[in-house]
A protein has these predicted regions:
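Membrane-proximal basic amphipathic "stem/tether" segments
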Residues: 1-49, 54
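C-terminal amphipathic helix plus adjacent low-complexity
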Residues: 2-15, 347-394
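Catalytic binding pocket for nucleotide-activated donors in carbohydrate/polymer assembly enzymes
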Residues: 273, 303-374
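Active-site and donor-binding regions of nucleotide-sugar-utilizing enzymes
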Residues: 41-202
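Nucleotide donor/acceptor-binding cores
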Residues: 39-40, 129, 215-218
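A donor-sugar binding/catalytic signature common to diverse glycosyltransferases
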Residues: 111-118, 122-135, 139-142, 285-328
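Donor nucleotide-activated moiety binding/catalytic core segment of transferases
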Residues: 94-110, 260-306
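Conserved catalytic-core segment of nucleotide-activated headgroup transferases in glycan assembly
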Residues: 53-64, 190-192, 196-269, 344, ...
Length: 394
């Protein structure tokens, strides 16, 4: 199946699921306007109310472990995942496809979301309720109201979403303007605070199989394109044999991470190399939990590099189709100005950049530090400051 076919299939799937959720939620959303709120109940949700990840996950865990006066719940409308999470964390996961789940969501004084998907669908759901949209990272590519290929129906969806959200999170004043333009908000609805997901970057590294301390570990995380398959090592002079020789000689391992739906698109001849492996999004679902184990990041347009900048480690950018991507998707900022790292055009240049990243990791440190002031909050405990804000609003 072609990548574009996969994308369309997923779009229809999520559109259908969202439509069902909206229809089944409407009576409860209306009832919600008049129901009594419980200040101690906080309901969290992530993508399509089906995943346990991103900013919502990390703030939820903070409340669960540290704020004992609150009753946090996470919406997981996926039976298998919900049961797995209940076994791990306890009875803190609800299904808003059920009457019981809907009723609990209605009672909550506070909703925390990472996408625009709310625990219940509807309009004006922020009425007598605090609804904070945390997002799932600082947007680099055109998103929402700034998408170059955005359809009218999607823009309408974002306009409707505005009626449900009290505040949308941004790491800095600078990125606040980006978020404001993407969602179509006014400045007064932007909450400047560090992102909960970045807190884990400063914690102790996880010990996982295949990550040895005597190697330089590189995360290669390109972003998917709607218009074409991803080209790995996109150089005309690329040599598979030479790549393996260099990696083996220099004790470098490259870990490739794709969107989970397209991992099968990774060329098998690459994965057969001893020093290249798949860092599967299916196995390692939350990349933030593992970001600090990597010494170098290779990407193109993935906003993961904003988070990686907090580590002040070297990055290599491979924007091989920059003009096409900018024309089709667009960017929220000047790409070349705000990407502090080498951008090789040939395989020979790439090898030089890779070795420089290994042997001279401080090359771009000053540039990264300066850009961090614009792109990232340097708060190492953003969950605490966000919790203080929430308590002050309810």
């Amino acid at each position: 199946m072609k990548q574009t076919d996969n994308i369309e299939k997923n779009k229809h799937k999520y559109t259908g699921n969202r439509l069902k959720h909206i229809i089944s939620s409407l009576p409860y959303a209306f009832l919600s306007l008049f129901s009594k709120r419980d200040k101690k109940i906080i309901v969290f949700s992530a993508m399509h109310c089906e995943t346990f990840d991103s900013n919502s996950k990390f703030l939820f865990l903070h409340f669960l472990n540290n704020e004992k006066e609150f009753s946090p719940y996470f919406v997981i409308n996926n039976d298998d995942l919900r049961q797995k999470l209940i076994q791990e964390y306890g009875e803190h996961f609800i299904d808003t496809r059920t009457k019981e789940g809907k009723k609990l969501a209605i009672k909550a004084r506070t909703w925390i979301i990472s996408w625009l998907d709310t625990p219940l669908e509807g309009m004006f759901l922020k009425f007598r309720r605090l609804v904070i949209h945390l997002g799932h990272g600082t947007p680099l590519k055109g998103l929402g109201m700034t998408e170059k290929d955005g359809k009218l129906i999607k823009k309408i969806y974002y306009l409707l979403g505005q009626t449900n959200i009290s505040y949308s999170l941004a790491s800095t004043e600078f990125t606040g303007d980006i978020v404001r333009r993407c969602i179509g908000f006014s400045k007064k609805h932007i909450l400047v605070n560090g992102q909960p997901r970045t807190e884990v970057v400063f914690k102790e590294k996880k010990q996982i199989e295949g990550i040895q301390d005597d190697y330089t570990h590189v995360l290669y995380a390109p972003t998917w394109r709607q218009y074409a398959k991803i080209k790995l090592f996109p150089f005309q002079d690329f040599s598979l044999q030479k790549l393996q020789e260099i990696l083996e000689q220099e004790k470098i391992k490259i870990h490739i991470r794709f969107h989970p739906a397209y991992e099968e698109d990774i060329p098998q001849d690459l994965l057969r190399l001893e020093n290249i492996s798949l860092f599967s999004a299916k196995k390692y679902t939350e990349i933030m939990d593992y970001l600090n184990i990597f010494d170098v990041l290779i990407t193109d347009y993935s906003s993961i590099y904003f988070d990686y900048m907090l580590l002040e480690r070297p990055m290599i950018f491979l924007p091989y189709d920059l003009a096409e991507y900018e024309g089709t998707v667009g960017f929220t900022i000047d790409y070349n100005k705000y990407t502090p790292g080498d951008k090789p055009n040939t395989f020979e240049e790439f090898i030089k950049c890779l070795l420089n990243a290994k042997n001279n990791p401080e090359t771009y440190t000053d540039s990264i530090k300066k850009l961090n002031l614009f792109l990232n909050s340097l708060d190492k405990e953003p969950c605490k400051s966000l919790t203080t804000f929430i308590k002050g609003k309810i």
